[in-house]
């Protein structure tokens, strides 16, 4: 990944933001007890998860094969977290940012790490339609506070050089990989690209990416359009990564674990047809044809009651295949027929 960051080309997110100017908070993922370290719920625990398989800490770049060189080689000891409450971690300290405007400013610049963000865009993000009369002075004051926070937590050789004022804007001069959102996008895209050929490695990458989450993305970054648009994008990619993870588990023959995950996800996201489809196939594969058909009936009822629509063509096709006991349902790679190709990677730089 080069200097483009999370939104290496901003067009996709700008379109999203413009089409949904009032994007709100994200729904919370399934499971609320804060105990399970499963990828669905690891970010609800409020701590860095460790993989049950290897014991590696996955909140930081412990495995070069997953993340490349140590994060602390990228941006002078600074790691900015946006997959949850906004925070700054370094090799010697870390924590959140108390001041709301400073937090929003750091988050907005982190979304475009390595790229300048214009003064106009920053003003819009911090104040929206009601900027103060002395808005540029106010922005400079918040930038000075943000620079102070970053400098206090950076290693000595980078102190003073992370947040820069450039012509017409500000720049967070760190490698995009120092932002957890970028690492998440990279990992889950790499994992999806391995399907269906290497489901074991795909599971490792997808789980590692999903465990970077500590809560809803950019949850405390304010209501500006850039942060809310990016948060909506991250949430969609998180759900897609969960779909890919479950498909990879099916490819490895892990139906029992996948079914348990899917039952939680269907309860949490009852209108997301892909989760229901995967659950139906999983139930059928373990000999629970009746439960698979009941899952379809419930999904159809929810869609009709809440949206007044019928299930989509793919869900209806799965229903017909289950009724007919179609042998295709037992084929390991059946779930990877078009249109379920690996997740789009156009948001990542080459």
UniProtKB/Swiss-Prot annotation:
Record protein name field: Transcriptional regulator RedD
Coiled-coil blocks: none
Gene3D superfamilies linked to this entry: Tetratricopeptide repeat domain, Winged helix-like DNA-binding domain superfamily/Winged helix DNA-binding domain
Family: Belongs to the AfsR/DnrI/RedD regulatory family.
Highest taxon in the source lineage: Bacteria
Pfam families: BTAD (PF03704)
Any GO BP: phosphorelay signal transduction system
Transmembrane segments: none
């Amino acid at each position: 990944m080069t200097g483009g960051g999370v939104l290496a080309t901003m067009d996709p997110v700008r379109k999203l933001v413009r089409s949904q100017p009032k994007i709100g908070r994200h729904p919370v993922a399934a499971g609320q007890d804060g105990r399970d370290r499963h990828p669905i719920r690891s970010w609800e625990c409020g701590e860095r998860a460790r993989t049950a398989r290897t014991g590696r800490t996955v909140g930081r770049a412990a495995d070069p094969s997953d993340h490349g060189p140590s994060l602390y080689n990228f941006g002078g000891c600074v790691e900015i977290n946006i997959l949850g409450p906004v925070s700054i971690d370094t090799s010697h300290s870390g924590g959140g940012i108390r001041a709301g405007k400073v937090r929003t400013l750091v988050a907005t610049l982190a979304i475009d790490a390595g790229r300048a963000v214009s003064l106009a865009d920053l003003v819009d993000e911090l104040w929206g339609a009601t900027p103060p009369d002395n808005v540029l002075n106010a922005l400079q004051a918040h930038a000075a506070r943000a620079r102070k926070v970053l400098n206090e937590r950076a290693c000595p050789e980078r102190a003073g050089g992370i947040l820069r004022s450039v012509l017409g804007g500000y720049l967070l001069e760190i490698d995009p990989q120092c932002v957890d959102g970028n690492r998440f996008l990279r990992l889950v895209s790499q994992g999806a690209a391995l399907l269906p050929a290497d489901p074991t490695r795909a599971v490792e990458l997808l789980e590692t990416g999903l465990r970077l989450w500590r809560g809803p993305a950019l949850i405390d970054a304010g209501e500006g359009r850039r942060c809310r648009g990016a948060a909506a994008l991250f949430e969609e990619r998180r759900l897609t990564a969960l779909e890919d993870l479950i498909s990879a588990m099916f490819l490895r023959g892990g139906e029992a674990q996948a079914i348990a995950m899917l039952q939680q996800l269907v309860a949490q996201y009852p209108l997301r047809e892909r989760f229901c489809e995967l659950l139906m196939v999983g139930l059928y594969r373990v000999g629970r044809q009746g439960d698979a058909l009941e899952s379809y009936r419930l999904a159809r009822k929810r869609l009709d009651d809440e949206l007044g629509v019928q299930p989509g063509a793919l869900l209806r096709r799965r229903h017909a295949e289950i009724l007919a006991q179609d042998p295709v349902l037992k084929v390991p790679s059946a779930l990877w027929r078009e249109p379920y190709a690996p997740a789009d990677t156009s948001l990542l730089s080459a």
